[in-house]
Amino acid sequence: MVTGLEAAGVVLALLPLLVNQLENYATGFEKLKLLHRYRRVFSAYALGIGTQQTIFLNNLEKVLEGVVEDEDKIGALINEPQGNLWKDVSLQDRLKAKLGRSHDVFMGNMIALHDLLVTLSDRLGLKISTGFSVCFRYGAASAENSN
C-alpha cells in the first residue's frame, strides 16, 4: 500500500518531468509560429519578385510593339531577355529609333533587372521556367505532398 509520503515522493519526482515536457511543447510551438511567419514573409517575397517580373515582361512587350511585327519573334525576345535575337543590328536600330536617347539606359536597365530577378529567384529557391515565369517551389511541393 502506498503511504502519503511515497505518493508525495512520486508526485515530486514527476513534477520536473512534466515541467520539462511543457517547456519542450512551448519551444516547439514557438518554432511552429516562426515557421509560419517565415512562410508568410517568403510568400510576400515570391509575390514581389513575380510582380517585378510581370512589370519587366510588360515593358519588354510594350517597347517591342511597332518594332517587331512577328508575334513569334516577340515571344522569343520576351522569353529570352538576353538571347541572341536582341543582338540583331536591325532590331537595335529600330529600338534606337523608337526609344531615342533612352535606348542605352533602357537596355542597361533591362539587362540589370533580368540579372537581379534571376539572382533573387535563385537565392529564394524560386524556379524560373519557360517564358521567364517565376514559380514558388514551396507551393508546388506542398500541393504535391497534400495528395
Q: What is the predicted function of each stretch?
A:
Residues 134-144:
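Solvent-exposed flexible segments
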